[in-house]
Amino acid sequence: MTDEFVKLLDQGCADLGIELSDQQKEQFFKYYEMLIEKNKVMNLMAITELSDVITKHFVDSLLLVLAAPELGLKLDGSAEYSCIDVGTGAGFPGIPLKIAFPGLKVTLLDSLNKRVGFLNEVIEALGLTDITAVHGRAEDYGRDAKYREQYDICVSRAVANMSTLSEYCIPFVKKGG
């Protein structure tokens, strides 16, 4: 793990009021390394510069923390929440949220099986628990009783326009979620 990586990550997280442990920083760094390596053979992300990955992928994925008080969410570990990341792609925002908030139960949903395979590699390499990568389409899984109305939180990035995204996400959120 480089000093530059730690400095940039600490700075971005501090702006959000998040303090990461050394283990969490190591997990973010390993995730970064895996993203860069896999991106050589699979188009996971266009942004690959260290500072941009930290700012535009990792820290941006954690912006939920700013809305948490408004939504009545306590992400300090004092309450358990389930979260589905629809169209997760390379794991954003689901994996950064899981690293920063280990008590979160996360489902990563993506329509491409090869990305789901990569996400499973990341989950194993980082030693993450209570996180599952699922291959499927939101419009199908939103009708499946196993997933429909099962989550407190639904997150997504760069999937569709807001009206379409709402149609994808709302079926996953339980009443009061």
What name fits each language-model region?
Residues 19, 43-46, 52-53, 58, ...:
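Residue-level preference for alpha-helix termini and adjacent loops
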Residues 164-176:
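A short glycine-rich, Lys/Arg-flanked "PGG" loop and its adjoining helix->strand segment in the class I
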